[in-house]
Amino acid sequence: MTKGGIRIKAYKLLRKKKDGLLYPLFIHKQYSTPIGEWMQAECYPTKGFSVRTGWHCCFQPLAPHLKMKLSSGEERVWVECEVEDWESYDRPESQGGSWILAQRMKIIRELSDDEVIQLKAEYYGFA
């Protein structure tokens, strides 16, 4: 695990509901996450999930183990965010590699599908 005290750019996968608001995928998922506001991480133990307090983010918009479109019609979108008071958490490449667990996060903007494709191409050296 690596700790980071500086503010960095990160990416987070969220649910976008019909109301246009953004929501976490699994933990505390009934509460929307506003754009442009700093949010403090809180601990919400949830059955079936390991307790890892912090906003779960990525260094790149990569989460190959998660689907973007579900049969339920749920839409998932990537957002660019800033995080503070974070640490990296090593995960297998099949889960996107290292995750970021941040104590503070601010969503900057939603990324378009084209932006996500471009960022992945740059990450894999195809751009």
Predicted feature residues:
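ADP-ribosyltransferase catalytic core
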Residues: 41-115
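Peripheral, non-AAA+ core regions of ATP-driven protein-machinery
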Residues: 111-127
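Intrinsic low-complexity, intrinsically disordered segments enriched in polar/basic residues
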Residues: 16-18, 56-57, 123
